[in-house]
Swiss-Prot record:
GO CC terms: plasma membrane
Keywords recorded for this protein, A-Z: Cell membrane, Membrane, Transmembrane, Transmembrane helix
Similarity comment: family membership: Belongs to the UPF0056 (MarC) family.
Organism expressing this protein natively: Chlamydia pneumoniae
InterPro entries in UniProt: Multi_antbiot-R_MarC
Name the record gives this protein: UPF0056 membrane protein CPn_1010/CP_0843/CPj1010/CpB1048
Compartment(s) where it occurs, according to its Swiss-Prot or TrEMBL record: Cell membrane
TM annotation in the entry: 7-27, 39-59, 61-81, 105-125, 137-157, 175-195
Length: 202
């Protein structure tokens, strides 16, 4: 039970739904609240479908392209590093709200890469490859984290009114620090295993 809770929390942090709230608020601000809820639900379902495909066929896909998991870990960690830096240096949310968008987003950029990014995919494939936890536990933890992320995003308009711009900015930067640490850990893990250096522990 503790393992499931820890994995669920890890995946929830990797989904970074609180940090994604400013993006959703900016892209969906011109729609009614009911329309926003429908779009968020649809995009989260798209993201879940993509994750299930990666969990089911991810290893075969990378083997077909002759891509090692360690390379994906290193590159995924680097991409996550750049994302975390942008999150920590994020401008005030109202700057992102200046751009008026009347086009309804479909899959990109909300489902991917905002909800389902390289961090989540890399973590899922890594845990599947390592075999430390069963596929059932990993899959269940992913579903739990996804459900909490969906709930968080559905409440985005409420969080926007409650915390305001400064609260959203502080939350985004806090998750940026957490993702930065995870990105370094992910790169160290990939480098350590790929080159058999042995400095990574955990």
């Amino acid at each position: 039970m503790l393992i499931l809770l820890n994995l669920s929390l890890l995946f929830y942090v990797l989904f970074d739904s609180p940090g994604s709230i400013p993006v959703f608020v900016a892209l969906l601000k011109n729609f009614s609240r009911k329309k926003q809820q429908r779009v968020i639900l649809r995009e989260c379902l798209f993201a879940l479908g993509a994750l299930i495909l990666f969990v089911t066929f991810g290893r075969s896909f990378f083997q077909f392209l002759d891509i090692s998991l360690y390379a994906f870990q290193i590159i995924g960690g680097f991409l996550l590093f750049t994302v975390s830096i942008k999150m920590m240096l994020a401008p005030m949310p109202e700057k992102a709200k200046d751009d008026t968008s009347k086009t309804e987003p479909i899959f990109f950029p909300l489902a991917f890469p905002v909800i389902t990014g390289p961090a989540v995919i890399t973590a899922l494939l890594s845990y599947m490859e390592e075999g430390i936890y069963s596929r059932e536990i990993i899959f269940t933890a992913m579903i739990i984290a996804w459900a909490f992320s969906l709930f968080t995003l559905l409440c985005s308009s409420f969080f926007d009114r409650l915390s305001g711009n400064f609260g959203l900015l502080a939350l985004e930067r806090l998750f940026g620090i957490a993702l930065l640490l995870m990105s370094v850990n992910l790169m160290l893990k990939g480098i350590s295993i790929a080159f058999n250096i042995g400095f990574y522990i955990g």
